[in-house]
Amino acid sequence: MDVTIQHPWFKRALGPFYPSRLLDQFFGEGLFEYDLLPFLSSTISPYYRQSLFRTVLDSGISEVRSDRDKFVIFLDVKHFSPEDLTVKVLEDFVEIHGKHSERQDDHGYISREFHRRYRLPPSVDQAALSCSLSADGMLTFSGPKVASGLDAGPSERAIPVSREEKPSSAPSS
């Protein structure tokens, strides 16, 4: 059986026939009644509409900025501590991996893991890369851009994640 995967912006009123929030990255967060019976929300109240952007904004989408002077990655990792995160540079890629062991929360036991990989622009100074985690759970990976004649340095190295006590200055999408 073929199942069409729809982007959340294009959800239709035929909710039971399309994927719901259950398949999104909301692991460990509570379920709503429309997650289990999505057709109820439109039949009980014709004025109720689920936010079209909620699943997109809350799904851990990263933001990558590359301007003339620097390269920056913002990634929401609010469920992870610096000890749970590993940031490595492998040649011209940065790999961010987060994993925490099973722990108890309000809804039972939960464990989380993610892996993201981004290509670094060739003009990024790999010797000056830094990574920090803000108090509100925003991981910021950044590096300055320089003249393109630099040696890339070692083919693999770890970038330590430092903790900041202030909230992130990254714009909320």
From Swiss-Prot:
Protein location: Cytoplasm; Nucleus
Annotated Zn(2+) 2 binding sites: 107
Segments of this protein annotated with the region Required for complex formation with BFSP1 and BFSP2: 1-63
Domain of life from the UniProt record: Eukaryota
Record SUPFAM superfamilies: HSP20-like chaperones (SSF49764)
Changes after translation: Acetylation at Lys-70 may increase chaperone activity. Undergoes age-dependent proteolytical cleavage at the C-terminus.
Residue(s) carrying Deamidated glutamine: 6, 50
Region annotation Disordered: where it falls in the sequence: 145-173
Protein name listed in UniProt: Alpha-crystallin A chain
Lineage: Eukaryota, Metazoa, Chordata, Craniata, Vertebrata
